[in-house]
A protein has these predicted regions:
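Histidine-acidic metal/acid-base catalytic patches
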Residues: 1-3, 10-25, 50, 56, ...
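N-terminal small/glycine-rich loop or linker at the start of catalytic domains
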Residues: 1-5, 60-71, 201
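Active-site-proximal loop/turn and secondary-structure-junction residues that shape catalytic pockets
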Residues: 8-10, 33-35, 66-69, 103-107, ...
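Active-site acidic/histidine proton-transfer and metal-coordination neighborhood
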Residues: 15-16, 52-55, 59, 70-161, ...
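Short, conserved active-site loops that position catalytic residues or coordinate cofactors/metal ions
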Residues: 24-34, 62-67
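Conserved beta-strand positions in the central sheet of alpha/beta enzyme cores
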Residues: 30, 62-64, 100, 132, ...
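Glycine-rich, proline-tolerant flexible connector loops at the mouths of alpha/beta enzymes
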Residues: 30-54, 103-107
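Metal-dependent catalytic neighborhoods of phosphoester/phosphodiester hydrolases
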Residues: 39-46, 73-78, 110-111, 245
Length: 267
């Protein structure tokens, strides 16, 4: 199942993103917390966003949460976990089984991160959703598969798993064998986009491309996931100002065509 992440069409309004995503043939959509925040800035309640998404007829693959809670403590931790619970409620109302969080960008205590993951897992479980946690290749500490896998493994919560993002896997130098070493039970969700072959800049990640345009071995990765038995959504998350400047319907169609060209024949 293939979903389009709303960040991919960031310069397009949410109603148009939903219409374009469905018309292009995607199976679902991934929502961000900022989609709700932008609506609130226009005086629209979260309930209105939920009605809009439900009316689109699209399945919701995942709902993003506010990041920063992994190393947080005291009042900021409480605030972020309250926001986390709110995103879980939205996901549940949309009949979406997954919420995702990017890793914290700075540095902190890994034991605290695992403890906070366990608490977040309890919140997710209470809403009957699963938390998928992503490492960010451009973060200071939680920037590779090994370290994030360690945090999640130490948390040992059945409602928490890894989010594998091909862009961050590629930028961090993860090998196919390292990805293959991750058991199916550890994988909660998948996001994907390609990494440019040249021109990469440390700390910058708004250069993502459709499959086949860069250095990620998509056919091998998709085959690997298929062989493992992963049958959840794979979400195309490709923020790129060059794409935002183009007609959104073209971006959505081209990305889906590029993705399908890399999928195993059975998919």
């Amino acid at each position: 199942m293939l979903a389009l992440h709303t960040w991919t069409l960031d310069s397009t309004s949410l109603p148009d993103v939903l219409r374009i995503t469905r018309a292009a043939g995607w199976d679902g959509v991934e929502l961000r917390r900022v989609d709700f925040a932008r609506a609130a800035e226009k005086g629209q309640a979260a309930a209105e966003v939920l009605r809009l998404v439900k009316a689109s007829g699209l399945r919701v693959a995942c709902v993003g949460v506010e990041m920063g809670w992994m190393f947080a403590d005291d009042s900021e931790r409480r605030r972020l976990l309250e926001a986390f619970a709110e995103s879980c409620r939205w996901a549940a109302e949309l009949e979406c089984s997954t919420v995702m969080s990017a890793s914290d960008r700075g540095r902190g205590d890994l034991a605290r991160a695992s403890a906070n993951v366990r608490e977040a897992g309890d919140i997710a479980a209470a809403h009957r959703v699963k938390l998928a946690i992503e490492f960010n290749s451009q973060a200071e500490q939680l920037n590779n598969l090994d370290v994030m896998r360690g945090v999640v493994t130490r948390a040992a919560h059945p409602s928490c798993g890894l989010l594998l993002d091909t862009y961050h896997l590629g930028r961090s130098g993860a090998t196919l064998s390292a990805i293959d070493d991750v058991a199916l039970a550890e994988i909660a969700y998948v996001q994907y986009s390609d990494v440019p072959r040249t021109g990469l800049e440390p700390g910058k990640a708004l250069d993502r491309l459709p499959p086949g345009r860069g250095s990620v071995p998509f056919k091998e990765i998709f085959e690997l996931l298929d062989r493992k038995g992963y049958r959840g959504f794979m979400s195309y998350e490709a923020p790129n100002p060059a794409a935002w400047a183009r007609p959104a319907d073209e971006v959505a169609r081209e990305a889906l065509e590029a993705t399908r060209a890399c999928l195993p024949a059975a998919r």
